[in-house]
């Protein structure tokens, strides 16, 4: 279901929506990008405008696109036939640019694979590829200089759109670059083929290009010899970073660009297949914005039958997003975005009175003598109803990983569960008990399905049913309300806070940060039932 959510208001029913989340703070998770094929028609979408009146903002747009796909991506076709298909998608792009221009949009982002589609072989994608000169070497305006290079029709159209809309434009396409046999890495067919993002300024100049580094089962494309660490400057918001889809889970280029170039804004074309409970598209987008205190402009393709939906304009404190697994329509999101994003309140700069639950949390962390630690519970002088018996530990598969979990029973309690070196802790209270099973899970190890990467995860999840073996299943609805602290002794500083409530709603934590060498997330007053609250740590050096 898709719906709108505005802090302080009631949920409004809407057939197609952008979910608007305003508020003190926000965070979320991560995911896998993939591609399969299905023929879907073209739709031009609705658009949502989020209105804010900050002095220092710019207007951004992201477009979730139900791309018109090749009916047979394995077939060998002519360049002309390939252009006919791509021009159908580009016609829709142009309509979105003109709609955005009427709203004074200054930058628009289109999704990965939105122009050419997916599931090609190296040979069958060739007619879809544009020649790509290096913007570092050649200054070029494709719209004004269309005959300078052959096989650049897609680049020309995108350049002209940027001019017509008077906006920066970010899009993704397949590109080719010839190589010489003297190059030991040159493929046998004499060319490199790249999954490429391009950036045009509002005057149509090709500002830069980024070639995807972390391919996700994309046999049609090559990995660049060196990682493209690409940033571009704008007159309206300063410096932006750029990367694509699966890149978000790896150090290069995503983390390195943020660390080395001090960017406050990221443009992020993606073709992301949702996988709950931890890796939905809007989860990772939001988590990235919160973890680094930046703005993320994320555009996904829209193919619900493939599990592909979820785009958004995310700041650390609010999100304007779209997720709809039922409707085939596209969606244009437009929002005003702060030039200087404000981050969440961390442990080190929190002010005001500490609430009782936080005092309890701090006592437990400090090993306060008023608290006696047992295997699974803590008895503090003011706590009367902790879990008397330690709940059983069990194992269940979540996201293809073997999690160790404990059930979350009762209206209040303190639990912990450990695996390898990671221990996860939960201090919670519930106003009422729901007829649902929740569990606290831990995983510390190498994830090896659909990519290989080392993760440390502490997760509070609603299980699919009442049996322990249902914990880790994909669910989107829940009624359980919690006030809680979730924390763990992570051995990485790269921790992404995942927070999802009923109906694919992005939730805002009250506080995040380090306390006594443990990273914690605190939340009270959920807006709807809890689906997932997790801390997703990445140990890049152990990949």
Swiss-Prot record:
Cysteines paired by S-S bonds: none
Keywords carried by this UniProt record: Disease variant, Glycoprotein, Hydrolase, Secreted, Signal
Residue positions the entry lists as glycosylated: 119, 150, 203, 349, 402, 489
One of the GO BP terms on file: biotin metabolic process
Disease affiliated with this protein: Biotinidase deficiency: A juvenile form of multiple carboxylase deficiency, an autosomal recessive disorder of biotin metabolism, characterized by ketoacidosis, hyperammonemia, excretion of abnormal organic acid metabolites, and dermatitis. Biotinidase deficiency is characterized by seizures, hypotonia, skin rash, alopecia, ataxia, hearing loss, and optic atrophy. If untreated, symptoms usually become progressively worse, and coma and death may occur.
Function: Catalytic release of biotin from biocytin, the product of biotin-dependent carboxylases degradation.
Name this polypeptide is given: Biotinidase
Gene behind the chain: BTD
